[in-house]
Amino acid sequence: YETAGTCGDTVNKSPHVPVTPEQIADSAIEAAKAGAAIVHCHVRDLDTGAQSRDPDLYKELTDRIRSSDTDVVLNLTGGTGADLTLGGIENPLPLSEEGTDMAGATERMRHVRECLPEIATIDMGTMNFGEGDYIMTNSTSQLDEIARQFQDLPVQPELECFDTGHLWYAKNQEERGLFEGKTMNAQLCMGVPWGAPDDMNTLMAMVNNVPLHWHKSAFSIGRRQLEYVAAAALVGANIRVGLEDNLYLSKGVKATNAQLVERATVILEGMNLNVMGPDEVRDMLAVSYTHLTLPTTPYV
């Protein structure tokens, strides 16, 4: 199956990156029409375009997608509230207010509880993410509490593993019963500085450590995104494309989410692979959709 990562942290780099809940929903729906069975969504601050965890924005986004006439599995990020930026090389404390947004487990899960997407992601560890003083921060105690909160919700977790240790910890959580009753589904996030590089040796190391009863997807970023459609398929993984991880269809040609999904579909069908639809994905991942309700007044 194909997941479309609709928007990340690149709002100023392409006119096609959606910002408002309406724009994100429209882009997600177009990606679904192009063949994505799952849409993975973040929301943005309406004034700055920066990533937001405002539950009202998530509610509007969710309602817009669910009130459309296009069927798609909704996957909301659970990665917000884990942003830590040190104060500088010589003075790491106090933390920099710009770029720091740390929240407790319950607050980080608030929009998931209120919107009840079919899937929500968990970033499975801490890492130096990109350059400078920024650290993606997920303590083991917080990850354990987030896993416990998933057990109370009709939402399946997607375990985003940016390195081998993240996958190791996800397996440890399952062994301790923290995901009891849940479908285990790993997203192997390759080539994100400074996690696991996206060479094939490292990909195979990740794939070979995913338990056989788990589902898995894999992606890379930038110009390697479309190459990884074929690479992921060859190692038995599902795929992800979209503007969260790559802005270009080809050199110098900026893409839309739908165009990236269309290109991925061409690659998969050229490999004689069938692309699954949303209902097939729901059945495979044991997604509960009996809880879904449409907004009383559809957005127009």
Can you annotate each of these PLM segments?
Residues 119-242:
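Catalytic alpha/beta core domains of metabolic enzymes, predominantly
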Residues 251-268:
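C-terminal helical cap(s) of enzyme catalytic domains, especially alpha/beta-barrels
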